[in-house]
Amino acid sequence: MGTLQSWRRAYGALKDTTKVGLVRVNSDYAELDVAIVKATNHVECPPKDRHLRKIFLATSAIRPRADVAYCIHALSRRLHKTRNWTVALKALLVIHRLLRDGDPTFREELLNFSQKGRIMQISNFKDDSSPVAWDCSGWVRTYALFLEERLECFRVLKYDIEAERLPKVSPGQEKGYSKTRDLDGEKLLEQLPALQQLLHRLIGCKPEGAAKHNHIIQYALSLVLKESFKVYCAINEGIINLVEKFFEMPRHEAIKALEIYKRAGLQAGNLSAFYEVCKGLELARNFQFPVLREPPQSFLTTMEEYMRDAPQMVDVTSGPLLLTYTPDDGLTSEDVGPSHEEHETSSPSDSAVVPSEETQLSSQSPPSVETPQNFIDTDDLLGLHDDTPDPLAILDQNALALALVSNDVDSSPFSFGQARDLDPSGWELALVTTPSNDISAATERQLAGGLDTLTLNSLYDDGALRAAQQPAYGVPASNPFEVQDLFAFSDSVSPPSAVNNPFGLYEPTYHQQEQQPQLQVAPSPANPFGDFGEFPIVPVSEPQSTTSFGAFPVPVSEPSNTTGFGEIPVVPVTEPPNTTAFGEFPVVPVSEPQNITGFGALPVTPASEPSNTTGFGEFPVVSVSAPQNTTGFGALPVIPVSEPSKTTGLGEFPVVPVSEPQNTTGFGEFPVNAGAHEQHNSNNPFGSTGFL
């Protein structure tokens, strides 16, 4: 067992040394962190004063509040991360010493920090390293609850019990008294429960088991005993003050005072038992324990008898009470006031509250005053001086309840209240018209049942609105997700292009011509490299094409196209001409579309198998039964019988299809006769081999 304890002490010392080295390197408050680690090390002894003085200096009023807050945060982190009861108890001891002997700035910052979370809430703390540690862990938890309640008591009392200096009652009396002796009844009922709860936590710090004989626990218990004397003194002085004010309190306050008095008697007995336990410890040599006496039972019985006869709480207003005077009733100023039935049957003018001087003047006036027939009081248009009318009277006089209105209209004179109920537009008309005492015009406008023209028109308008809002049968329901057109208010005005086409702003300046099922003549797009001239398209029945070598008529049924280099007839069948960025090169696709490259227009017309070209030039190959092949030394075109003529970008080479087609090149004409077996001709690059 001794070896295990020695190993644990060595391990704790190693952890403390490592922690000190780490905080010296990594912490911005190295000196404060080192003092906190050394004051809360694993050694079972009270914190040393030299380490406490450094912590007191860091939390003094001359230091910034940020340093005080960092100290509280470091102590809280040290308390909640440890699993050793010695480190936890020494951290609580440092906090207790700062609350007792430290600057008030620390208490204020600790209150602000406790609002975010309880710093000393360690109800789950437990050290299972040994049976002694088990008992000590229980006392550490009760000690933390006492410190937490001490902080809460400071929040209620607004002052610290331990820091309170007890004044002398008189020069010849040595015993002082607490602030609770001079409190009024309301504050006394607020502060005494907080002090009694603090005393309850203090009595709970009674050590048990192995914790009674631990040296560091007895050191912390001595601090608790010192505070118990002042806490009990404050409660005792408050009870004396409470007893003096008890017989002057109303019933609800007397009930609270009686509960406080009963709890004080019970706590006196518990505190005496706590002192008896402490007297058996070594620390009892430094303390002189007071003798506590419980309150007499006879006085408690007297207080309970007073509670049965105590008056109820009555709220009496300080202002003068105004009574309503009615001439018909023989009430005097000593009566309480008119009954509820008389209050309901009285007229609005009689129920108005008037001062006492006007009451005396009204007693001398006649008991009733005749109200003119056509008189309306315009001073009270909203009826603020009138009481709430009877619902049955409103139902009988309601002009909108047509089913309840009789046909017989009473033409007798009516008072102002009746005119107001029958005319639903009373105060609205009075706001827009000149005040007048004559209501004959309004009476003439009224119809049967008390209705007037304005009310009747409003009923018709309301009926038309309800009919318009009713759903029509057979009409498809509207789509709730359909977005309404912003320009639907006018069909004659077309909306701007930005609404119809939101992408119109981002379209390029040139547009590609769409393919049409019929032959169309479209304007040529602009050439970015310059315009070589106009290229008219003239449809003829049999156009003739010419070159620099001669005229070569080509009978076609479609119009010919020309370019800036010469006339190159191209017969479009179904597809429009295509252009590139280097110029206009019309290509007429027969069954397959033409392909173009970046070096120029190389039209390829597939018959059964399309022609092939190379990078040295254009070599169209037209296959009849077996297609012709060309070489890189010259173009050997073979034109089938039923196929149109082909052109290139180097010049115009018309080919006239006959029963036996002829082939030409740029150096001359080379006729080729096609029979059962097709002949292949080749050109001599140094001259022509035959002429027609």
UniProtKB/Swiss-Prot annotation:
Residues 325-383 are annotated as: Disordered. Coiled coil: none annotated. InterPro entries: ANTH_dom, ANTH_dom_sf, ANTH_N_plant, AP180-like, ENTH, ENTH_VHS. CDD domains: ANTH_N (cd03564). GO terms for molecular function: 1-phosphatidylinositol binding; clathrin binding; SNARE binding. Keywords: Coated pit, Cytoplasmic vesicle, Endocytosis, Golgi apparatus, Membrane, Phosphoprotein, Repeat. Residues 24-161 form the ENTH domain. GO terms for biological process: clathrin coat assembly; clathrin-dependent endocytosis. PROSITE patterns: ENTH. It is found in: Membrane, Clathrin-coated pit; Golgi apparatus; Cytoplasmic vesicle, Clathrin-coated vesicle. Expressed in the whole plant. GO terms for cellular component: clathrin-coated pit; clathrin-coated vesicle; extracellular region; Golgi apparatus. Sequence repeats lie at residues 532-548, 549-564, 565-581, 582-598, 599-615, 616-632, 633-649, 650-666. It comes from the Eukaryota. The keyword Kinase does not apply. The modification Phosphoserine is found at S363. Residues 357-376 have a biased composition (Polar residues). The keyword Phosphoprotein applies. This is Putative clathrin assembly protein At1g14910. It comes from Arabidopsis thaliana.
